[in-house]
């Protein structure tokens, strides 16, 4: 099939129609999107080849893999920048706290708490335990949730990044932390970290430590099941 160029708006219309309907025939897609049939056929063929679509019994439907990516595709196609959820971990051993010096923006070169993005299918404790191990080699154990905080980073008073932090506490049995690939790691005196004696610590992380180290928060974890007949059940 010869390459046919679709505009971003045409691709968005096709994707939007497939998100809003579980199954659509080709003619229904033509009606829903108002995209020329040759362009539509090309895009559907491309999406099927990339395993984004399944074509069966004369209808097209998003694959389960594609449905997992709906929130991300929507932001890209609409050119939206969303809030990024990040799991943070407070790792202490005796009177020390373990910090990571960031190698990447934002906050490149600053020391801060361990953390990262959640992989689909992980629980929050699984995420932060994995992140700590990947970043310093320690097998940390999740202990509790401390807080949920929304942080916005601005540049010249204009929004640059927006984060939703889930702050947690983890326990470790040793101080044998080693640098991996994410940046340098080091133990610092906890009190000196709070009073500003340690240079280049992310200011909001210092605030989190001062405010939430001894706090506890409740976060519910629920699992929903979607069935072939479109019914939903809440698992216990």
Feature-to-residue mapping (PLM):
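Acidic, metal-coordinating catalytic segment for phosphate/diphosphate chemistry
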Residues: 59-88
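Short, Lys/Arg-enriched N-terminal segment that forms or immediately precedes the first helix
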Residues: 1-4, 86
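Conserved Nudix-box catalytic region and its N-terminal flanking loop in Nudix hydrolases
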Residues: 31, 35-37, 96-134
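Nudix hydrolase/Nudix homology domain
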Residues: 4-9, 17-37, 120, 180-236
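Unchanged
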Residues: 118-141, 151-204, 235
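A short, conserved structural fragment
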Residues: 48-58
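Short amphipathic alpha-helical interaction segments
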Residues: 34-48
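Short, leucine-enriched amphipathic alpha-helices that occur as contiguous helical runs
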Residues: 7-12, 111
């Amino acid at each position: 099939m010869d390459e046919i160029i679709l505009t971003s708006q045409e691709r968005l219309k096709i994707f939007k129609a497939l998100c809003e309907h579980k199954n659509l025939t080709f003619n229904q897609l033509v009606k829903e999107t108002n995209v020329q049939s040759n362009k539509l056929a090309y895009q559907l063929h491309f999406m099927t080849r990339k395993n984004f679509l399944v074509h069966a019994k004369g209808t097209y439907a998003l694959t389960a893999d594609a449905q997992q990516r709906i929130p991300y595709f929507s932001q890209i196609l609409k050119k939206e920048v969303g809030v990024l959820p990040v799991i943070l971990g407070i790792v202490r051993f005796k009177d020390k706290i373990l910090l990571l010096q960031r190698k990447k923006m934002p906050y490149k070169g600053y020391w801060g708490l361990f953390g990262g993005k959640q992989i689909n299918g992980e629980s929050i404790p699984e995420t932060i335990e994995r992140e700590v191990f990947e970043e310093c080699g320690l097998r940390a154990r999740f202990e509790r949730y401390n807080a949920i905080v929304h942080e916005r980073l601005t540049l010249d008073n204009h929004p640059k990044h927006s984060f939703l932090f889930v702050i947690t506490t983890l326990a470790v049995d040793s101080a044998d932390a080693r640098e991996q690939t994410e940046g340098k790691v080091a133990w610092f005196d906890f009190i000196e970290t709070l009073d500003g004696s340690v240079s280049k610590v992310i200011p909001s992380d210092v605030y989190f430590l001062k405010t939430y180290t001894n706090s506890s928060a409740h976060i519910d974890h629920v699992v929903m099941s979607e069935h072939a007949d479109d019914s939903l059940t809440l698992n216990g």
